[in-house]
Amino acid sequence: MTVAYDRESISMATSATSGKTSRQRVPAAERRDALIEAAIHEFAQDGLHGTPVDRIARRVGVAQPYVFSLFGSKRELFLAAVERCFEQVAELFDRAAAEFDPAVALPDADVLQAMGTAYVEMLSTDRDRLMLQHQAYAACDDAVIRDKVRGVYARLVAHVQRLSGADQERIDDFFRYGAWLNVAAAMGVEDLSVGCEWIRAEAMDDAPPPGPSGV
């Protein structure tokens, strides 16, 4: 019988049986997860084209060639980060749905509202997931990235519909409001309505000076 061993297993076994002390090797799967989390943070700040891979590698404590050995290219790492980001939003909705208790909720509250509340809380505490969504949409001039973003977005919509059991109109409203919240949170404001104070103030600052008649 032929038994196949990977190089990492051989290295760990050799270290365990030798008299020499060596640093414990981190499994490739753990390194991959750590690199994806680091990529979420770095790509959220500077996007696909503005983020050097070696900055992500340094954050995890590995060499840049190792990153390419796992992901192949910076674009593939970016795609993995985007997919993980949307998966984490789906997991957030899972927890909100599981924790929703109609017995203690407000009379008109339901699972969909609980998921919306959880998302609002995430936006206030996790800017990386927010900004990576914007960076993903901004990179959609690349057809491969566009296809990935469409796919993860569509899966999230279907997931929310399954969890909530809400009709199409409410699901549409949920995601429209979510997009509105994303823009507001990115700008650091709480309101985007026409009559809100900061929009009125900005409009006054940009208004042309009055003419001779004072109008």
Language-model features: locations:
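Basic, helix-initiating cap at the start of DNA-binding domains
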Residues: M1-D46, G50-R59, E76
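Residues at secondary-structure transition points
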Residues: S22-V26, E30, G72, E76, ...
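Alpha-helical structural segments
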Residues: A34-H41, Q45, R59, S69, ...
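Key DNA-contact positions within bacterial/archaeal DNA-binding proteins
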Residues: P65
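Helical hydrophobic small-molecule/effector-binding pocket
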Residues: L106-H134, A139-V144
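Hydrophobic/aromatic-rich alpha-helical bundle segments in the mid-to-C-terminal region
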Residues: A143-V215
